Regions:
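Acidic, Ser/Thr-rich low-complexity segments on the non-lumenal side of membrane proteins
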Residues: 165-176
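A structural "domain/chain start" motif
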Residues: 2-71, 77-100, 160-162, 177-214, ...
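Short, low-complexity, glycine-enriched hydrophobic/amphipathic alpha-helices that associate
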Residues: 86-140
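Membrane-engaging insertion elements
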Residues: 10-15, 120-164
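Long, contiguous hydrophobic alpha-helical segments, chiefly transmembrane helices and signal peptides
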Residues: 58, 76-78, 142-148
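A general secondary-structure signal for short beta-strands and their flanking turns/coil
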Residues: 73, 139-145, 187-189
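Intrinsically disordered, low-complexity segments enriched in small/polar residues
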Residues: 1, 103-105, 169
Length: 224
């Protein structure tokens, strides 16, 4: 019906948005210290490979990517937690819950319509046609939820006191407090959640997956 036509026009172009739950500000470094170690884990049931994309994104920015974390000045560790259909509300909720928080629900946003009442053959045919149009035009969202830990070496003579407390039932969500003090810690640690969302009429997963991966890679490489 009219709703399906409006959705088809409004959502004809693929739109991808990538957001972070928390802003992270890292100390600028000289080019000699632009060395990063990247490790990405995928704990979903989908075939997702974004580690190489993230590494290439850093290399294009002039960073040296190393396989030994002891050689790195920065460390990026990420876990792809969930990939699949969602809706705008679920994506916002998962983002607000932050690192280690709740994941997406099973909601899927789509345009649906109902048939007309039994008030005549013409009305019935029109209702069926409208229903068929509505079921063929679906407003599809796919999202990729990734928890990210970024580490940076302390500056010369900078001492870091770092404490961590798990407070979720699963022990996955944590807060980190840091103060410049006397204890010698190897890394300054920052955590955030990154969610990339793709939206388009009748969007297919394979097309969405490629764009979601690009969004995550671009977002993470932009941190340094």
């Amino acid at each position: 019906g009219c709703g399906a036509a409006a959705t088809a026009i409004e959502k004809r172009d693929l739109v991808v948005q990538t957001k972070m739950s928390d802003s992270i500000f890292l100390e600028p470094v000289s080019s000699q210290k632009q060395i990063v170690y990247v490790k990405v884990r995928n704990t979903t049931d989908k075939d997702i490979e974004i580690e190489d994309q993230i590494k290439r994104a850093f290399e294009l920015k002039g960073f040296k990517v190393v396989s030994n974390p002891d050689e790195a000045y920065f460390m990026i560790q990420a876990n792809v937690l969930q990939v699949g259909k969602t809706d705008a509300t679920d994506s916002d909720s998962a983002l607000k819950s932050g690192f280690g928080g709740g994941l997406l629900g099973a909601g899927v946003s789509m345009a649906t319509g109902g048939s007309g009442n039994n008030i005549g053959i013409g009305a019935a045919i029109g209702a069926v046609a409208g229903l068929l149009a509505d079921t063929m035009v679906k407003d599809i969202y796919y999202s990729m939820v990734t928890d990210v830990e970024i580490r940076q070496r302390p500056a010369i003579n900078e001492k870091i006191v770092q404490s961590e407390e798990n407070y979720s039932d699963q022990g996955t969500s944590s807060t980190i407090s840091q103060n410049v003090n006397t204890n010698d810690v190897q890394w300054k640690i920052y955590r955030t959640r990154v969610i990339s969302t793709a939206n388009q009429v009748n969007l297919q997963f394979e097309e969405a997956k490629a764009e979601l991966s690009k969004g995550i890679a671009k977002s993470l490489s932009g941190l340094l």
